[in-house]
């Protein structure tokens, strides 16, 4: 892990993005915003899953009315996602948005952007400048021959500078493409240019499987180089899955508390059903906010030997299963009791941690 790139902090309601604040997890509702009850229920589900900021699309006036109610009852700050209409951006701020996401390039004239900025200033609402490969200005596409990393960066810098000229500095930036390499290179380049907090993501990443792979590689690469202050994993599926993947990315880089499951790929030596046991353990621990490494190994060659760094683990043998802690065997039990014994040992270990 590289030392974290220095950015300035931006307050989004009660949550800070950038500076020395931890990397935060965002997601976006996929309900009809006008359905206030269903959207609020999804917001609460996202928060329960570990989401700290939730973005809501505001496509029309009726959605603004619903959004106002949502801001009053949401347990976390809400971000209004705006495209094309500067009037909707202004109304979303008035409705209680803690941040707005715009692409100044599709809001309209400089005068219209200035009206949004003035309203944001009045309400102390930060702006995220969202630059996507599909919405880069035509002159930059011609200059660079397409949505290259340099084209994306120049678009982002130009928009940040425009807001700065209007006296507005609370700007978070996102530079996203569906191509992982383009996204990584663009964010790396931007990080050398300006100190604005960076929102990471791979846009239109795809299905849960494909999107998880692309997001983990792209976002993980940037975070491992110290770049990034908040993230959203974009998946064609439930936003709850987005939060789960985001938590996994942060946990795997030791940037957030959470469980890690270590399991062997299995071979002819396996004496237990590693896949089933590991999947069950993973599901049981998915909401845990404690750093804990649990190993599920097929034989005593892999566990506890190769999994000795795990806090708690199990391994199979021909006649029984073993339970180990920090590489030392602490119990031998019938294999059909391994899951029960492991679950109890995990609970006891967590209690030990919390009692210290």
Curated annotation (Swiss-Prot):
Amino-acid positions noted as binding [4Fe-4S] cluster in the UniProt annotation, renumbered to this chain: 264, 267, 299, 306
Family of the protein in this entry: Belongs to the IspG family.
Q: Which organism is it from?
A: Natranaerobius thermophilus (strain ATCC BAA-1301 / DSM 18059 / JW/NM-WN-LF)
Alphabetical keyword list: 4Fe-4S, Iron, Iron-sulfur, Isoprene biosynthesis, Metal-binding, Oxidoreductase
Q: Which GO terms describe its biological process?
A: isopentenyl diphosphate biosynthetic process, methylerythritol 4-phosphate pathway; terpenoid biosynthetic process
The record describes the protein's role as:
Converts 2C-methyl-D-erythritol 2,4-cyclodiphosphate (ME-2,4cPP) into 1-hydroxy-2-methyl-2-(E)-butenyl 4-diphosphate.
The protein's name: 4-hydroxy-3-methylbut-2-en-1-yl diphosphate synthase (flavodoxin)
Q: Which domain of life is it from?
A: Bacteria
- Keyword Iron (UniProt): yes
Q: HAMAP family given for it?
A: IspG
Pfam families assigned = GcpE
The record describes how the cofactor is bound as:
Binds 1 [4Fe-4S] cluster.
Cite the EC number.
1.17.7.3
Q: Which InterPro entries match?
A: Dihydropteroate_synth-like_sf, IspG_bac, IspG_bac-typ, NO2/SO3_Rdtase_4Fe4S_sf
**UniProt xrefs under PANTHER family:** 4-HYDROXY-3-METHYLBUT-2-EN-1-YL DIPHOSPHATE SYNTHASE, 4-HYDROXY-3-METHYLBUT-2-EN-1-YL DIPHOSPHATE SYNTHASE (FERREDOXIN), CHLOROPLASTIC
Protein's UniProt keywords contain Oxidoreductase: yes
Q: Which SUPFAM superfamilies match?
A: Dihydropteroate synthetase-like, Nitrite and sulphite reductase 4Fe-4S domain-like
Q: What class of enzyme is it?
A: oxidoreductase
Q: Which cofactor does it need?
A: [4Fe-4S] cluster
Pathway where this protein functions:
Isoprenoid biosynthesis; isopentenyl diphosphate biosynthesis via DXP pathway; isopentenyl diphosphate from 1-deoxy-D-xylulose 5-phosphate: step 5/6
Q: Which reaction does it catalyse?
A: (2E)-4-hydroxy-3-methylbut-2-enyl diphosphate + oxidized [flavodoxin] + H2O + 2 H(+) = 2-C-methyl-D-erythritol 2,4-cyclic diphosphate + reduced [flavodoxin]
One GO term in the molecular function aspect is:
4-hydroxy-3-methylbut-2-en-1-yl diphosphate synthase activity (ferredoxin)
Give start-end ranges for the coiled-coil region(s): none
């Amino acid at each position: 892990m590289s030392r974290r790139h220095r950015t300035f902090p931006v307050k989004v309601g009660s949550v800070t993005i950038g500076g020395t604040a931890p990397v935060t997890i965002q997601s976006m509702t996929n309900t009809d915003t006008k359905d206030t009850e269903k959207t609020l229920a999804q917001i609460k589900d996202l928060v329960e899953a570990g989401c700290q900021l939730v973005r809501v699309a505001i496509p029309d006036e009726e959605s603004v009315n619903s959004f106002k109610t949502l801001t009053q009852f949401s347990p976390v700050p809400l971000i209004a996602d705006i495209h094309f209409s500067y009037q909707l951006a202004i109304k979303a701020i008035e409705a209680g948005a803690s941040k707005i996401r715009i692409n100044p390039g599709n809001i309209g004239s400089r005068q219209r952007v200035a009206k949004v900025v003035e309203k944001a200033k009045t309400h102390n609402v930060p702006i995220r400048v969202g630059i996507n490969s599909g919405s880069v200005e035509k002159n930059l596409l011609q200059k660079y021959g397409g949505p290259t990393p340099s084209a994306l960066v120049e678009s982002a810098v130009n928009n940040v500078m425009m807001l700065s000229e209007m006296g507005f500095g609370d700007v978070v930036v996102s530079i996203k493409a569906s191509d992982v390499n383009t996204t990584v290179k663009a964010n790396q380049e931007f990080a050398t240019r300006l100190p604005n907090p960076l929102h990471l993501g791979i846009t239109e990443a795809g299905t849960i499987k494909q999107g998880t792979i692309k997001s983990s590689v792209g976002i993980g690469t940037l975070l491992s180089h110290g770049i990034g202050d908040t993230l959203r994993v974009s998946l064609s599926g439930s936003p709850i899955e987005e939060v789960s993947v985001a938590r996994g990315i942060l946990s795997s880089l030791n940037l957030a508390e959470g469980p890690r499951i270590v399991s062997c790929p299995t071979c002819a030596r396996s004496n237990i059903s590693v896949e089933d046991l590991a999947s069950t353990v993973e599901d049981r621990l998915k909401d845990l906010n404690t750093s804990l490494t649990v190993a599920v190994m097929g034989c005593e060659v892999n566990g506890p030997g190769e999994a000795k760094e795990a806090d708690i683990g199990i391994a199979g043998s021909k006649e029984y299963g073993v339970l180990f802690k920090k590489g030392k065997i602490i119990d031998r039990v019938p294999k059909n009791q391994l899951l029960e014994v492991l679950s109890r040992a995990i609970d006891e270990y967590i209690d030990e941690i919390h009692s210290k």
